[in-house]
């Protein structure tokens, strides 16, 4: 439990931005059982559909609860492997900014999660997310703290990214 889903909704509200749900959570909730390796490809396809539907609306900012990197990482974490077509697509569809939620919140079991999620398992998953995102050249900002401070940390990261992006566009416009 990193507070990612709650944070996604709060950020979308703060920035008046469209947001996506977590395809794996939705998929498994519909199935009513734990995820299996045979579910990875349908989850990935659903994730792509969710992203593509959201991206078509012309907004300047989108908040995704997860993307294909989550599918890749959890598949490796749970099953030790992932279908080969997913990783190249992760890189091709890489988001502009990733907020990596810390594991500093108290763990709360939900029906989606596999295992007991011991502190060591949570740290391993967090480290795997950090290394895969970094290895794939993703722009990553850490988000930690509790409650409103966590939200403010995330808002600050996005505002900084937006201002840097706007400044880069302005410099490009000036040089043309």
Language model: regions and residue ranges:
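Glycine-rich phosphate-binding loop used to anchor ATP phosphates in small-molecule kinases
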Residues: 42-93, 100, 108
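Conserved substrate/cofactor phosphate-moiety recognition/catalytic segment
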Residues: 9-52
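Catalytic phosphate/metal-binding cores of nucleic-acid and nucleotide-processing enzymes, i.e., regions
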Residues: 31, 61, 163
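A short acidic, often aromatic-flanked loop/helix-cap motif at beta-alpha or helix-coil junctions
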Residues: 27-28, 147-152
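Short, glycine/charged-enriched secondary-structure capping and boundary segments
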Residues: 11, 34-35, 76-79, 112-116, ...
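Conserved lysine of the Walker
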Residues: 4
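A glycine- and Lys/Arg-enriched "phosphate-lid" helix/loop adjacent to the NTP-binding pocket
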Residues: 79-149, 162, 168-173
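Walker A (P-loop) phosphate-binding loop of P-loop NTPases
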Residues: 1
């Amino acid at each position: 439990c990193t507070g990612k889903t709650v944070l996604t909704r709060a950020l979308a509200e703060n920035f008046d931005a469209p947001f996506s749900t977590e395809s794996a959570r939705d998929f498994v909730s519909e199935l009513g059982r734990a995820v299996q390796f045979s579910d990875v490809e349908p989850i990935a396809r659903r994730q792509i559909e969710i992203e593509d539907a959201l991206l078509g609306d012309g907004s300047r900012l989108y908040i995704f609860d997860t993307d294909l990197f989550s599918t890749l990482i959890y598949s490796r974490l749970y099953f030790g492997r992932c279908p080969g077509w997913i990783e190249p697509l992760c890189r091709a569809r890489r988001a502009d900014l990733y907020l990596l939620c810390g594991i500093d919140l108290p763990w709360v079991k939900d029906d989606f999660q596999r295992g007991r999620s011991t502190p060591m398992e949570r740290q391993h998953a967090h480290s795997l997310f950090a290394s895969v995102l970094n290895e794939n050249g993703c722009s990553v900002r850490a988000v930690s703290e509790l409650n409103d401070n966590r939200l403010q940390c995330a808002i600050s990261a996005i505002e900084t990214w937006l201002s840097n992006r706007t400044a880069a566009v302005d410099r490009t416009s000036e040089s043309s």
